[in-house]
């Protein structure tokens, strides 16, 4: 049976242990500015995926990935000493793509703002294609605009009986 609360607690504990060990315990010069962003533990508590970001170039990211891979055994033993579980989960380090995705989204939002500003500038300089007020005004009863109702049909239905195709209803 999967206990999600226990898996979440273990993930939080692993995140804290690994971050502390990376900050103070590993002396590998290849490790750059590493930040542990998230840890996910499987429901059976056998595997932990550790997401991290690295501040720096692609080469520094690759060096940091190699340093983390070489330190995985030591980090796993440190996790095993500090958690209360029968088995120590295996650790997998995954480079987190959130910062790059966030930068791409920020660039897209900036482009959208620029385009919106361009559209607003064009709208201010634009003129109406037709009348300025395209809406039909309601007729006021009592105006003498249409006098042909008085001389129209006897039955008052305003049907043009001389129109082509007109057939009277039977």
Swiss-Prot record:
The organism's place on the tree of life at top rank: Bacteria
Subcellular location: Cytoplasm
Keyword annotations of the record: Cytoplasm, Ribosome biogenesis
Chain intervals for the UniProt region annotation (Disordered): 123-170
Molecular function GO labels: ribosomal small subunit binding
Keyword Cytoplasm: yes
GO biological process: maturation of SSU-rRNA
Keyword Cytoplasm found: yes
Primary residence: cytoplasm
Amino acid composition bias (Acidic residues), ranges on this chain: 143-158
Cellular component annotations (GO), alphabetically ordered: cytosol
Family, per entry: Belongs to the RbfA family.
Quaternary structure annotation from Swiss-Prot or TrEMBL: Monomer. Binds 30S ribosomal subunits, but not 50S ribosomal subunits or 70S ribosomes.
Role of this protein: One of several proteins that assist in the late maturation steps of the functional core of the 30S ribosomal subunit. Associates with free 30S ribosomal subunits (but not with 30S subunits that are part of 70S ribosomes or polysomes). Required for efficient processing of 16S rRNA. May interact with the 5'-terminal helix region of 16S rRNA.
Name of the molecule in the record: Ribosome-binding factor A
Gene source species: Clavibacter sepedonicus
Gene name linked to the record: rbfA
